[in-house]
């Protein structure tokens, strides 16, 4: 896979993670809780994206500008923080999850900001 294609693929996955996290938060606010399966599904997807970003980072490292590299790093941190936040919450009731909505909203805001930065940046150059 070319570096351009890899970059676009990761960008699309970050955008999808943003959409999924936003939808999760809206449902969480409306219902007041989330089921274990809903929580685990999102958490697993976020951890999978973290793994993929970490796996492809060396290939992208020399192909992107410093600003893009920093935005990718911060977006990855936001995804990882959201996934870790979703690890907690089984304590109150084994069937439902009570996550820290403020932490998830903070992760979503950082992710959204860095997606915008990446979308506004110039196309990457080939290494």
For each predicted feature, which ranges?
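Amphipathic alpha-helical binding modules
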Residues: 76-127
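Short, charged, amphipathic alpha-helical segments
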Residues: 8, 36-47, 69-77, 95-106
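Short terminal alpha-helical segments
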Residues: 1-46, 108
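Leucine-rich amphipathic alpha-helices with coiled-coil/heptad-repeat character
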Residues: 21, 28, 60, 64-67, ...
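Charged, low-complexity interaction regions
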Residues: 26-37, 61-66, 87-98
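Amphipathic, well-ordered alpha-helical segments in soluble domains
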Residues: 13, 17-20, 45, 49-56, ...
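Short, solvent-exposed, charged loop/turn and helix-capping segments
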Residues: 48-73
